[in-house]
């Protein structure tokens, strides 16, 4: 009898704990009544990786498998383009940026291209074989000027159209899984294993290393509109950097949804909405600083992981996989 009573008590305790825990963890969030995004099928198995525009109408999209597309209507439609590259090399075009009519493309392995006529013609620039790492991020800075960052945190700048490059750091950060640049020229990166992040400010010669704030490995990191940082860790954890200039002051973990898929990128829209994108069509938005979240109904229907947001003054895109792309059209969908 005592054994039976003990078993019943244990079962009741398990049920109580289960109910209690289910109130702390949400497996679903409400679905928004409308979406500002429109799905575009690029009809390719390549992954779109970056977008940049010469003006509000004309721009380019680049991606894996040498993919380059051109638009003349703000990104509603994309047409195939090609680059004069060796057929035997399957380049991954990872970054593109324009300043007016001058544009740059960075790719892997060892690819850098330059245009001075709005992308109608591209010239390949051959990089020094001693360049640390592979090109990862290119930023157009003005006439004949650009900044190149590699996947080991080396940063180089040119002021002569890419004929020569000057190193900005004396010691690279090591292999990175994510690297972002702010509008003022600062950089932040996540180490290849996700066990620490590093920051670099213009004028400094080395990266500053910072340990992660929890046992969860870091996935990605970037800049909020006010210059503070955001962080995404494994386990679908979001943290926001609250300190004024203190890059080690982080909020408690925000876990909007536990659907088994992590987040890969974040972005802020012009109205202050916070967007998080990730695996299996996960696309969430918060309109109250991260306190509550909604699922985007268009993103939820896409058979793709969302890997990156691209926002500029006139456009916004969510980049997926296998030709999946979302374009911002406003709250009309």
UniProtKB/Swiss-Prot annotation:
The keyword Nucleotide-binding does not apply. InterPro entries: PSII_CF48-like_dom, WD40/YVTN_repeat-like_dom_sf, Ycf48/Hcf136. One of its GO terms (cellular component) is plasma membrane-derived thylakoid membrane. It comes from the Bacteria. One of its GO terms (biological process) is photosynthesis. A lipid is attached at residue 24 (S-diacylglycerol cysteine). Keywords: Lipoprotein, Membrane, Palmitate, Photosynthesis, Photosystem II, Signal, Thylakoid. Its main location: membrane. Part of early PSII assembly complexes which includes D1 (psbA) and PsbI; not found in mature PSII. Binds to the lumenal side of PSII complexes. Interacts with YidC. Belongs to the Ycf48 family. This is Photosystem II assembly lipoprotein Ycf48. The gene is ycf48.
């Amino acid at each position: 009898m005592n054994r039976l009573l003990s078993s019943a008590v244990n079962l009741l305790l398990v049920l109580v704990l289960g109910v209690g825990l289910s109130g702390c963890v949400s497996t679903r969030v409400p679905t928004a009544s409308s979406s500002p995004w429109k799905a575009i099928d690029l009809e390719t198995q390549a992954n779109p990786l970056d977008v940049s525009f010469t003006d509000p109408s004309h721009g380019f999209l680049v991606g894996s498998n040498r993919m380059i597309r051109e638009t003349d209507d703000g990104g509603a439609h994309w047409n195939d383009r090609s680059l004069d590259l060796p057929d035997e090399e399957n380049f991954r075009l990872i970054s593109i940026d324009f300043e007016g009519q001058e544009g740059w493309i960075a790719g892997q392995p060892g690819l850098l291209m330059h245009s001075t006529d709005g992308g109608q013609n591209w010239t390949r620039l051959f990089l020094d074989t001693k360049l640390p790492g592979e090109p990862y991020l290119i930023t157009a800075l003005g006439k004949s000027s650009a900044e190149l960052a590699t996947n080991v945190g080396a940063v180089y700048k040119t002021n002569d159209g890419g004929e020569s490059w000057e190193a900005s750091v004396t010691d690279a950060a090591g292999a990175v899984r994510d690297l972002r640049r702010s509008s003022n020229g600062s950089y932040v990166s996540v180490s290849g294993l996700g066990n620490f992040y590093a920051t670099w400010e213009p004028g400094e010669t080395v990266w500053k290393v910072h340990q992660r704030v929890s046992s969860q490995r870091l996935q990605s990191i970037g800049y909020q509109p006010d210059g503070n940082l955001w962080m995404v860790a494994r386990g679908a954890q979001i943290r926001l950097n609250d300190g004024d200039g203190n890059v080690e002051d982080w909020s408690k973990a925000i876990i909007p949804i536990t659907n088994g898929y992590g987040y890969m990128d974040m972005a802020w829209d012009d109205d202050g909405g916070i967007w998080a994108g990730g695996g299996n069509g996960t696309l969430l938005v918060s309109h109250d600083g991260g306190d509550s979240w909604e699922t985007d109904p268009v993103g939820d229907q896409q058979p793709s992981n969302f890997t990156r947001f691209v926002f500029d003054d006139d456009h916004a895109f969510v980049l997926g996989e296998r030709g999946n792309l979302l374009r911002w059209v406003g709250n009309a969908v």
